Amino acid sequence: MLKFTKITLSALALITASLGAANAAVTVLGWPGGSEETALRAVAEAYNAQSGVADADKVELLFYSRDGFYDKLQADMAAGSSAFDINLLATYSIGRYASYMEPVDLGPDAAKVFGESVLKTMQFDGKQYGVPTDLSLHFMYYRKDLIDALLADPAAKTKYAEISEKYFGKPLEPKAPDSWTWDDWAATALYFAKSVNPESPVRYGTVLQMKNLLFNIMVWQSVARANGGDWMDASGNITIDSPAYRTALELYKKLYDAGASPKDSLSYEYAETNAAFGSGQVATALQWNAAAGELTDPAKSPAVAENVGIVAPPAGSAGRADHIHGLGLGINKNAKNKPGAAKFLQWLATEDAALLYARSGGSPALLPDVAAKIAKERPDLVTLGQYAGAYGYVMTGATSANAFPVYELQAKEFTGYWSGQETLDEALANTKAGMEKLLKP
């Protein structure tokens, strides 16, 4: 049976001893929680069950908290830890960890499964450092039944116009979600908030991920990007204090202060967002694509699954934008079982393994002919490829060695603004000053 453990940084030093006789096994430090963990468990179980896998090469999984994950990982790898053979890596952090990792040959079939462009998300300086397991971007999830009822009700449209005029200074008409601007989405969220509209059939219009966590900034920042926002200009000047960023930050605060999102949203991230939307009391949610499998599964989200609609994030003055990055698994340079680790990653890059990973809730970016084999079960993976190609972006400077500290800085300052601990001017000034230090040439 597959073993897995949740660990903290202090516990990593004890892993070698705690594994005992299993020291020869392939230990995998994965991404904790969510569909990525679920899918990794499934493929590891399947791999271990194969008759051709020696006991010394069977996989064991390790997990620790998302908070500070990459800093902990870097500290471990820089210290020469051999507590894990395989570790998580991401497009935006490969350069940070490449010197601590071993390039891997995934075999000739990997390109037939993922395609060269996806394989490149796990490459650095022309070398392959991992197998791409998940492509991450964001979907706008919404309740089809609620939106359909709004669009069909003249009285509801009148109420919607009144609410939008109060909050945006202009009356807006309800639209189909695929035609939403960010103002349209916000007006819809306000309409479905009982604090704003006591006649709303649900309690909240949306659920915002506002915890002081860098990944929440990745979700939010598409509002700024859609309005032309970026971290830096072509000359390397920090451009964070811009109308695009101000508009995006103010929009979230407006919704939060109005009660369109739960008051404890300041502690929300991925799991809390899924739970809130899945409860049936939320009309919309900007959430990672990985949530699609759970939110559209009647067994996991019975209150909403049959009525979940999915579109790309709304448009701003510069069009639509969707943050994108890849997650994968690579080999620790100090791994105790490099041959066993390479075998597991090579297997993970096969079509059968990729399809199992997808069926188990993961979100691999697959070539069309491979994705077609799972389109009925996972239509979101087809959508994933479409949105990535049309709206995907990476902020200028967001693949640098200090990308994570920048995201952490933004999370701290922007959450401070949303929670009322500092003004918008203070938050942007502090962020700009910090980014100028972190991203200086």
Segments predicted by a language model, with ranges:
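Hinge/lid segment of periplasmic solute-binding proteins
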Residues: 89-141, 145-154, 183, 216, ...
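Long, aromatic- and glycine/proline-rich binding clefts that accommodate carbohydrate-like moieties
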Residues: 122, 306-312, 358-416, 441
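Extracytoplasmic "Venus flytrap"/periplasmic binding protein-like
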Residues: 26-27, 46, 51-117, 121-123, ...
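Helix-loop-helix "hinge/cap" segment bordering the ligand-binding cleft or interdomain interface
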Residues: 49, 55, 124-215, 229-265, ...
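Extracytoplasmic/periplasmic substrate-binding proteins
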Residues: 30-31, 48, 94, 217-227, ...
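Short, polar/charged alpha-helical segment
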Residues: 34-58, 141, 410, 428
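Extracytoplasmic "Venus flytrap"
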Residues: 26-43, 64-67, 136, 211-214, ...
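Extracytoplasmic/periplasmic substrate-recognition and gating elements
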Residues: 55, 126-128, 146, 257-260, ...
